[in-house]
């Protein structure tokens, strides 16, 4: 293997800190602890079935399976990953509290550990339903400032808009383990060297192309889509002979981290929009620890993130596990989808997947 001099994550954080002479080392320590948690999870994921961690937590049958606060069946690796984030991050003295997809209420830092000035919110293992079929999964995290002068953090402390994030990122556990991070000054990707146990800067200054020919959406929900989404997808599927004048490819991995990573690497647009499948839910993805961190990364990389109706990071949260519609990726495509929402297109637009260019079109 050729010798290449690369900056480690620690060196990168030190360089960033030098831009702010009055900054303490606490923030760097927090990010390094998050990275350590991701290394442990990467190792557990890599062992797969050999580690005995595949399958549902609580038992193999649905009747005995563990259910999280979202009403979703927990995988064994969900539980392990959540415990790893808590254990690795609680002791450092950098945090006032944590919140996770897997826990109903905020996690209080134990009294015998020092209390810090940051909050950490995370999805410990995004895409965990893909574990048993060996599809890439990941961890998503966001760092916020904690309110001053409170002993125990409450849910309210975490209800900050995405614009208040201090840092955000994800770890992708795939053929290689990558940590993709923003501290509010661009987006950088680090690859884990499994021999040295170090993250090295391999993808500096990631940028999302403004234009794309790829989109990602779960087409099985097409009958529930609102008119602007149906219009956008219909135009993409019409290809070169349609109003867009070019062909598009459609992707869907069912792992948000993997989708976001592909878009950061080569462009694209991801849509998990609000729909009518469950009118009580304004979306599927969680605002605080899924949508906002990815939105921060996209915006810092020159892309855009939106609900379709407003900038994603401008949404004022009203609950710890609030769900929301999410659209992100190449700026020009996201702006087009926003424009379709603003124009309130025809609600009776035909479903593109079951009419023109479809195997399901009724014969005349």
Curated annotation (Swiss-Prot):
Tell me which UniProt keywords the record has, alphabetically: Carbohydrate metabolism, Cytoplasm, Hydrolase, Magnesium, Metal-binding
Provide the residue positions that the database annotates as binding Mg(2+) 1: 101, 123, 125
Enumerate the catalysed reactions.
beta-D-fructose 1,6-bisphosphate + H2O = beta-D-fructose 6-phosphate + phosphate
- A matching Pfam family: FBPase_C
Q: Which residues bind Mg(2+) 2?
A: 123, 126, 290
- Keyword Magnesium assigned: yes
Q: Give this protein's Gene Ontology molecular function annotations.
A: fructose 1,6-bisphosphate 1-phosphatase activity; magnesium ion binding
- Give the GO biological process terms: fructose 1,6-bisphosphate metabolic process; fructose 6-phosphate metabolic process; fructose metabolic process; gluconeogenesis; sucrose biosynthetic process
Enzyme class, first EC level, given as a word: hydrolase
The listed locations are: Cytoplasm
**Pathway as given in its UniProt record:** Carbohydrate biosynthesis; gluconeogenesis
Q: Where does substrate bind?
A: 126-129, 218
The family database entries (PANTHER family) matched by this protein are listed as:
FRUCTOSE-1,6-BISPHOSPHATASE-RELATED, SEDOHEPTULOSE-1,7-BISPHOSPHATASE, CHLOROPLASTIC
Matching entries from HAMAP family are given as: FBPase_class1
Protein name (database record): Fructose-1,6-bisphosphatase class 1 2
């Amino acid at each position: 293997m050729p010798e290449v001099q690369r900056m480690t994550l620690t060196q990168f954080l030190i360089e960033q800190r030098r831009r702010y002479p009055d900054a303490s080392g606490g923030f760097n320590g927090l990010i390094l602890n998050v990275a350590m948690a991701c290394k442990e999870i990467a190792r557990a994921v890599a062992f797969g079935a050999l580690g005995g961690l595949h399958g549902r937590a609580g038992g193999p049958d649905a009747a005995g399976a563990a259910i999280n606060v979202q009403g979703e069946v927990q995988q064994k690796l969900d539980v392990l990953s959540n415990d790893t984030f808590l254990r690795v991050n609680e002791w450092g003295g950098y945090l006032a509290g944590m919140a996770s997809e897997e826990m109903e209420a905020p996690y209080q830092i134990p009294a015998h550990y020092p209390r810090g000035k940051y909050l950490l919110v995370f999805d410990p293992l995004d895409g965990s339903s893909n574990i048993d079929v060996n599809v890439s999964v990941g961890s998503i995290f966001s760092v916020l400032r904690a309110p001053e002068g409170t002993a125990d953090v409450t849910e309210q402390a975490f209800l900050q808009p995405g614009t208040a994030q201090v840092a955000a990122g994800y770890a992708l556990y795939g053929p290689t383990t990558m940590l993709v991070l923003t501290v509010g000054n661009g987006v950088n990707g680090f690859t884990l060297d499994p021999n040295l146990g170090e993250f090295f800067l391999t993808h500096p200054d990631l940028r999302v192309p403004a234009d794309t020919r790829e989109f990602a959406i779960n087409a099985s929900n097409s009958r529930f889509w609102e008119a602007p989404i149906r219009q956008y997808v219909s135009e993409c599927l019409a290809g070169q002979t349609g109003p867009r004048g070019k062909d598009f490819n459609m992707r869907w991995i069912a792992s948000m981290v993997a989708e976001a990573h592909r878009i950061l690497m080569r462009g694209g647009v991801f849509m998990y929009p609000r729909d009518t499948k469950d009118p009580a839910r304004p979306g599927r993805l969680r605002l605080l620890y899924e949508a906002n961190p990815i939105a921060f990364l996209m915006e810092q990389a020159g892309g855009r993130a939106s609900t379709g109706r407003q900038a994603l990071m401008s949404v004022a949260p009203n609950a710890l596990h609030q769900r929301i519609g999410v659209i992100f990726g190449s700026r020009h495509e996201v702006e087009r989808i926003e424009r379709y929402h603003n124009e309130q297109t025809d609600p009776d637009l035909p479903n593109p997947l079951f009419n023109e260019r479809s195997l399901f079109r009724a014969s005349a």
